Amino acid sequence: MSYISSLREVIGNRPIISVGATILVINQKQEVLMQFRSDTLDWGLPGGSMELGETLEEVAARELEEETGLLAEHFELIQVFSGSDGYFKYPNGDETYGVIHLYQAKGVHGALVMEDGESLALEYFSKENLPKKIEKRAQTLLDALGDRCFEREHSF
């Protein structure tokens, strides 16, 4: 059982502070990898919460592999988001204030695979073709980066 799940058994839906990593993967066409999420039924960026004893880079590596099947040689920290930018209420009522560490995956290899049940689809999107229904936290990150998001060196 994950740390967050075991915590939720004790405190229920009350707001928590969670620390996690969100991963930006950019292909050679300057498109950003997004996942259609099974929990919120909208598009987001791969990522998740830290487990006890993990480093943030380990969180990024684990979540990238679990949610996309991709592996990365290393991760570059882009920015940290917190406060109201990290607030989210899940459809089940769970509330969280995330301390979100946005990383770009570097030296990415492997094939896109959905095995964890969290992703219903994985797709790369250009700046001009972003999906209409983007999850709040992902939209906040994309808005904060603006054009810089799509001007970064690719991840492969």
What do the PLM-derived regions correspond to, one by one?
Residues L71-F81:
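A short coil-to-beta-strand element that immediately follows conserved catalytic motifs
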